[in-house]
Amino acid sequence: MKFKSLITTTLALGVLASTGANFNTNEASAAAKQIDKSSSSLHHGYSKIQIPYTITVNGTSQNILSSLTFNKNQQISYKDIENKVKSVLYFNRGISDIDLRLSKQAKYTVHFKNGTKRVVDLKAGIHTADLINTSDIKAISVNVDTKKQVKDKEAKANVQVPYTITVNGTSQNILSNLTFKKNQQISYKDLENNVKSVLKSNRGITDVDLRLSKQAKFTVNFKNGTKKVIDLKAGIYTANLINTGDIKNININVETKKQAKDKEAKANNQVPYSINLNGTTTNIQSNLAFSNKPWTNYKNLTAKVKSVLKSDRGVSERDLKHAKKAYYTVYFKNGGKRVIHLNSNIYTANLVHAKDIKKIEVTVKTGSKANAERYVPYTIAVNGTSTPNLSDLKFKGDSRVSYSDITKKVKSVLKYDRGIGERELKYAKKATYTVHFKNGTKKVINLNSKISQLNLLFVKDIKKIDVDVKTGSKAKADSYVPYTIAVNGTSTPIASKLKLSNKQLIGYQDLNKKVKSVLKHDRGINDIELKFAKQAKYTVHFKNGKTQVVDLKSDIFTRNLFSVKDIKKIDIDVKQHTKSNKALNKVSNIATKVKFPVTINGFSNVVSNEFAFLHPHKITTNDLNAKLRLALASDQGITKHDIGLSERTVYKVYFKDGSSKFVDLKAAKQDSKVFKATDIKKVDIEIKF
């Protein structure tokens, strides 16, 4: 048995090495495929989505003028969002990772289009494994409160000067401030540097753009009612110093230089529009552009409206088709208006002039698709660790569902979100989900139960679903009991263990099956051989010192049940040769025992060196094969089946006259040459799995 363990260990190491090599190869191949996929995606491009964000630092907010760029319908983690948030904090407001760690509060809120939101602590460094779709995000708001240090006294001495930026007539609300030390004497040169800095960071206007602009100036409005206009292009400064406490606000005005393209721009007509989606209206900040041929028909106008609906609000043709309401209203400068239905394919032949249009209002109310697809929020708690309500279970079609349908969806999200499959659920200590209804009632369902609930329920009545799983580690679910096997007085060391389940009490009948299984597997002794054995029993040693002997040949079992945890070890004892004494005496009188050493892969004394032959003076290779196979099976548990599965099993027989012969034990037939068993000097067996 020791030798079999040695061979098995060597084989396992070889398989591990081979598997490791395959794994590395597969990993490299997968990595290469990923690179190819990435490069392919990069080559073909992704549809992008812009998500607006705001930054509030110490209560001072910034207007929504910037957006975070993501791939449309991309599954991202909160770690990905956090990286982008930290990047814009550093770029826009100069707040580094160290500043965040030392801050009093640092968080960001993800606002979803379904009205829910999720607050994430930037200082925690803990991220859930949930993935979210970028198309579900409406906006992101970032809030940082710097920690009050000793320097706060100096911070209190600072003064905030509000400013506005107007570029080509488009003004920005006063939502940001320039920071100066209170009552500090500064020059207009210092002021200009600050102005140029906010122009670059807020509106992307560089020094080169300022030099090429038609006009670039800023006006300093003082608290005493006076003001001072400074030309940003002049480069000439007065030597006057001003007190920061005297400044009321600063107005920045830039007009970009008109190039040749301005002629084409003049020819274009800009029509402002607004979009009302499910009652939520966006400000009129964008325009529909019409070419230098201002006459257009309503079909072209509808195409432009559908385009901005998709780009601005993500409303596609399919969404419009299922919408309850989808139309736009064209307001003319003469006071008239025209309502056009977006789902209608009938258009009037009238042409309209872009200059006559005052504005366009788009109204969409999603309808039948929203009703056909219902969403129920859910949480997952695994071993007490819960995820927030960030995801929903999606139900399609019929408004009524069964608990069986819900169970399938719950198992699906468990596998997708937390990697818990059917096997893990089967061995879990607890696996349930609770359906909370809007009327305050709730229903707990066991995920491992095979009893079907026939009740049907309306999805609209479900408030939320809480999933709770407590995994029982596989090691704790099973116990391993050491055992020994003694056949005809030859015992094996305690090298193997019986695997028994901890989940329930067991009886001796259950233990019998396990013992018979290892007897057949380890020593090749089946039920028939046990039946004809002289003795077949096993002894159960308990940890409290007691023992129990069980007869393997008996079909009568005590009804006692006991815990696997109480078993210390099991000793199995089998004595074969159950033929009658007369037959045994006859065999012993005829058979002659011949001794010669046998080694396996160079190891000696691992099998018997005594063999009984009926006719030792005339044996063939087939007779020797049979004896060696029997010795391998009884002494080392290497059965004929194992030999058949081996890569190579041969032996070399050495004779006393100096000759030798190679024999393949896997071969069915050997030569019929006769020789004497007493002429054998030794046998060397080589086995390779």
Curated annotation (Swiss-Prot):
* Name used for this protein in its record: Protein map
What is the purpose of this protein?
Both native and recombinant protein bound to labeled vitronectin, fibrinogen, recombinant osteopontin and fibronectin. It was also shown to be able to bind to a 15-amino acid synthetic peptide of vitronectin. Map could affect the severity of arthritis and osteomyelitis in mice through a T-cell-mediated mechanism and could play a role in abscess formation through a T-cell-independent mechanisms. It could potentiate the survival of the bacterium by modulating host immunity.
Question: Which positions does the entry assign to MAP repeats?
Answer: 45-154, 155-264, 265-374, 375-474, 475-584, 588-689
What organism is listed for this UniProt entry?
Staphylococcus aureus (strain MRSA252)
The stretch of residues making up the signal peptide is 1-30
Q: What InterPro entries does UniProt report for this protein, alphabetically?
A: MAP_dom
Its keywords, alphabetically, are: Repeat, Signal
Q: Which domain of life is it from?
A: Bacteria
The answer to whether keyword Repeat applies is yes
Q: From which lineage does this chain's organism come?
A: Bacteria, Bacillati, Bacillota, Bacilli, Bacillales
